Design a protein with these regions (language model features):
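Basic-flanked hydrophobic alpha-helices used for secretion and membrane insertion
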Residues: 1-310
């Protein structure tokens, strides 16, 4: 990626990272504590991706003889929601529950933090990971409509994922983030506020059957905009609850087809989270390229389609 902040540790907890972490019972998915955020924020870096790709494509340094595969990751974050919209539309990719913190501390750090969530693309080369993981339930995903839940070596997931998966009410996590934000800015020490976020750590376990088959809905970012014929601009409808409910209900369904965990403590090419196939990324790219809003912007590159101004 061009720029980023290393937030992997915030979402990935191994047995060696926490003395409180215990292996999950056989046939169960356990939950480990969410790490404190302050310990995982790193300086953002900028990379020259164009030059790097040219170098790799031309076998720079004889790299073809030293690697099994070269993987490219696109700066695309799927817009994914929980399927149940009966109470509200709950976006889980990118997760919106950190808005209070972003508002208080600025979008620079936490904007990147929000983009690093449970969902991520798995490598296109399956040989990079299949032998390093055991399928404990279901099967590896195939196609753009399936995803896989990746556990740690002890069979656990961070407690954050309980909210993502709908095992706990996502509103609880919203309140947790709000408490963190208010505690930090209200005079409490940062460590004290963080201990509050960890107090919600769960010791629950879940049957594989409670997670396998869980569905989500993906929508296209451009579908959140509709054309305003009066002002001749594209209008953001993401704050329109009725519009968003209809959009999410009709979105692409993603289903957890399997649950996997590393077959050794060395792990593999995957991290804890919900991994989707490259086919989903390609579908998002294709649908975006064919969308009216993108076509309109390309037709008039000097005009901002959101404001109508040059």
């Amino acid at each position: 990626q061009k720029t980023g902040i290393d937030m992997t540790a915030a979402l990935s907890v191994s047995a060696s990272d926490s003395k409180d972490s215990q292996p999950a019972p056989d046939g169960k998915v356990g939950v480990s504590k969410l790490r404190t955020f302050a310990d995982t924020i790193r300086d953002a870096k900028t990379n020259d991706l164009a030059s790097l790709k040219t170098y790799l494509d031309n076998n720079g340094g004889g790299i073809d003889t030293m690697v099994k595969a070269i993987e490219y990751d696109y700066d695309i974050v799927p817009q994914i929601y929980q399927s149940d919209t009966s109470k509200a539309t709950v976006q889980v990719s990118p997760d919106q529950s950190m808005k209070q913190m972003e508002a208080g501390f600025g979008s620079g750090a936490f904007g990147s933090m929000v983009l690093t969530n449970a969902f991520y693309q798995m490598p296109a080369t399956s040989s990079l990971y299949t032998s390093a993981y055991d399928v404990v339930a279901g099967s590896w995903p195939s196609g753009a409509n399936q995803v896989v839940l990746v556990l740690d070596e002890d069979g656990n997931i961070p407690n954050l994922f309980e909210y993502t998966l709908g095992l706990k009410d996502h509103k609880e996590f919203d309140d947790l983030m709000r408490s963190y934000y208010q505690g930090t800015l209200g005079g409490k020490s940062q460590s004290g506020a963080q201990s509050g976020t960890q107090s919600g750590a769960s010791t629950a376990t879940y049957d594989y059957s409670a997670i396998l088959g869980t569905t989500f809905r993906r929508v296209n970012a451009f579908d959140k905009y509709t054309w305003d014929d009066t002002y001749k601009v594209w209008t953001d409808r993401s704050s329109d609850a009725d519009y968003m409910k209809k959009l999410v209900d009709g979105g692409q369904q993603l289903t957890i087809s399997g649950i996997v965990k590393p077959n050794s403590d060395k792990g593999g090419a995957l991290r804890q989270g919900i991994a989707y196939t490259p086919a989903l990324t390609y579908r998002i790219i294709e649908e975006a390229a064919a969308s009216p809003i993108v076509k309109a912007q390309r037709a008039k590159p000097d005009v901002d389609v959101f404001t109508g101004k040059t």
